Curated annotation (Swiss-Prot):
Spans traversing the lipid bilayer: 4-24, 40-60, 64-84, 108-128, 134-154, 165-185
Main location as per UniProt: membrane
Any one GO CC term of the record: plasma membrane
Molecular function GO terms recorded: manganese ion transmembrane transporter activity
Subcellular location: Cell membrane
Function comment: Probably functions as a manganese efflux pump.
Name of this chain's protein: Putative manganese efflux pump MntP
Domain of life: Bacteria
Keywords, ordered alphabetically: Cell membrane, Ion transport, Manganese, Membrane, Transmembrane, Transmembrane helix, Transport
């Protein structure tokens, strides 16, 4: 292995971990909904796939659109996470059996898009720098999948401690993360 490849591997691994921590944080909030292990596995895989597809799409888009779509992707992702958080808080205080947004079907799709939109922007910049696309998307997918699982499992544990208030706390975490994206400091 050449030093150049090792340098790129380390750089992309650090970047993949950073993007995956977003998925961990949001997974922590979503994990406070009562989830089965099969659902946790499925959610992690879907998030991982989106963390492969989004940067790949970003790399394909290249530098032509990076200035406009880069910030737009961040704002869309922040808005989706904010909306999911509000809906989770509403569901926590509503007298119903299930969450307002289910982490399956269209709810999972919104969740995955919201969490992975920042990786689209990263893909745009990686496309301009000529990074190895296969290595980048593989690392992004693996890190985000594993960190999503960790967040969901940790959220599940917190849910067992907090009971019915855990979904409201999960919603607050998603709102906070969405606001962080919408209102950069």
């Amino acid at each position: 292995m050449s030093n150049l490849f090792i340098g790129e591997l380390v750089s992309l691994s650090i970047m993949a971990f950073a993007l995956g921590t977003d998925a961990f944080s949001v997974g922590l909030g979503m994990g406070m909904i009562q989830l089965k292990k099969k659902q946790i596995f499925h959610i992690g895989v879907v998030i991982g796939l989106f963390h492969v597809m989004m940067p790949l799409a970003g790399m394909a888009a290249g530098h032509l659109l990076s200035g406009f779509l880069g910030m737009l992707a961040v704002y869309i992702g922040g808005s989706l996470l904010f909306i999911l958080g509000v809906q989770m808080i509403i569901a926590a205080f509503k007298q119903s059996d299930g969450p307002l947004i289910s982490p399956a079907g269209s709810g999972l799709l919104l969740f995955a898009i919201g969490v992975s939109l920042d990786s689209f922007s990263v893909g745009l910049s990686l496309g301009m720098n000529g990074s190895n696309p296969f290595l980048a998307v593989t690392l992004f997918g693996v890190f985000s999948t594993v960190l999503t699982w960790a967040g969901l499992l940790a959220g599940r544990k917190v849910q067992s401690w907090l009971g019915s208030y855990s979904e409201a706390l999960g919603g607050a975490i998603l709102i906070g993360f969405g606001l962080k994206l919408l209102l950069p400091v």
